[in-house]
Structure formats: C-alpha cells, structure tokens
Amino acid sequence: MTAFDADLRSLAAQTTLSRRTVIATSLATGFALAVQPVAAQTTIATDANGLIAGEVKIPMQDGVIPAYRAMPAEGGPFPTILVVQEIFGVHEHIKDVCRRLAKLGYFALAPELYARQGDVSTLTNIQQIVSEVVSKVPDAQVMSDLDAAVAFAKGTGKADTARLGITGFCWGGRITWLYAAHNPAVKAGVAWYGRLVGDSSALMPKNPVDVAADLKAPVLGLYGGADQGIPVATIDRMKEACRAAGKTCDFVVYPEAGHAFHADYRPSYRAEPAQDGWKRLQDWFRQYGVA
C-alpha cells in the first residue's frame, strides 16, 4: 500500500481543475472545492458568540504560517487543544470544530500545515491534492510546526499548555498519533479515522503502528468499520502494537460508518457515531487531564 492509498480509497474523486500552485499566506474561506457541493442539510454551524475566534499568524524560523484560533472571550488561561486538518486543509469545518471546542472552554488552534507546499482550497480533484501538495509535506516539518503552534499558544498568555491535547481528522488523524509519540507535553490525543499503516518514505518514514511503543500520551482512535481505506485488520494491528508496548490506547469502531463520518458538511456524515465520538472525545480529555 502506498502512503496515500488509504486516503484516496476513502475519499470520492471529483472533477479536475488545473491551476498554478499558490503558497498559502492566509486561510481559505468556506469549504474546499474538492468537497462541493456541501451537504447543507447536515452542516453544523457554530457561532462565535462569547468567543474570540479568527485567523492568527504563527511565527516559524522561515516565516509565518496561518492558523485558526478560537477561545472563550473571558477568563483563561484555558486548556489547549491542537486541531489537525483533514486532507482538505483548514477550511470551514475545521474552524467550526475549533469553535465547538472553545465553547467547551478550550483554547483551540488549527495551524495550516500545508502552507509551505501549496493551497489545496482551490483544487477540485483529490488525486491532485495528494500529488501536488499533501504528498510533499514532510512529517518532520509537521511535528516542528505543531511544536511552534504550542509555543505560540503559550506565548499568548491565554493557553495553558500544561494541559495540552490534540485531535485530528483523516490526514490529521494519522498526525495525531505521530505527535502523541513526538511531544512529551501532550496529555491526550483523539484520532479520527487516521491511517495507521503504509509504506515508508523519506518524507514519511514512520506510520502510527511504527511509533506505538513511543507514545507519550493516551490516544483514543475513532474509526469506521466500513472505511474502505482503513481495513479493520489494520486497526487490530495497531491495537496489538499498543498492547504489546503497554500503552494506554482505546479504539472505537462504528460498524456501519465509513471514512469521514464526523464531517457533517459531506455525504459521508453519520450523525450517531459522530455525536458519540464527540462525547467520547470530551470524556477522554477530561479523564487524562486536558479538561
């Protein structure tokens, strides 16, 4: 299995649009073109009442990257959650997830982790998103950028990074596992349908199953039993790797759900597992000292 076979099988291909790659200097508005039309009847829209929410710039050694931040308007410092994007980048759904977390009392931060490689928001073909942008993003760069995001959050004075959690979806689900093995400051992680196995490469030398023994925080994995790109056998393999390493991990597999069952803006959305997973996320962060 090549590195992105799981993602490509899990996501429906769309029509092709040629374009010139543009380096992202700000976040996209709305939803990624690759998921149009949006399933408006199920899309959840969380308001920003009582919140400070919007785009920020995170300093890096080689410049800045855009990010979306949401937090309560009053009080703090707040427990901190990194929100890691799907394959489609930091679009409206990821921003809405940040606002949902902020309504629960968190400082939520979603950095645009593709910023150096290109802007996926104008692409309408998933294979193109993978080949032109996502496949060129090194895991080491992502880990470093997330470290910088934590430092940025701490520097605001509004984020309690001693209570640090991470959650991610699809591409970000895989990153959630990797970051929980990378940063000892992480208290807990929740990975939504993130790929667990795959071929290694120079840019992506390890997958979650390879770093199970290095996990530094408890991780909850939320998966769909009908996900065509993430076979249940690979989930079982990750379970065994965590068990053999003596790591605290839990897995919930929703039998009838496919990939992206939490993505309420897409036809893949399944309300019951999405709502159950969201409750489990809250309980997991509370249990392991993030809340």
UniProtKB/Swiss-Prot annotation:
Pfam families, sorted: DLH (PF01738)
**Residues the record marks as active site:** 170, 227, 259
Q: Which Gene3D superfamilies match?
A: alpha/beta hydrolase
* UniProt keyword annotation of 4Fe-4S present: no
- Recorded GO MF terms: carboxymethylenebutenolidase activity
* Protein's organism: Methylorubrum extorquens (strain ATCC 14718 / DSM 1338 / JCM 2805 / NCIMB 9133 / AM1) (Methylobacterium extorquens)
Q: Which residues form the signal peptide?
A: 1-40
Q: Which Enzyme Commission number(s) are on file for it? A: 3.1.1.45
| Protein name as catalogued | Putative carboxymethylenebutenolidase
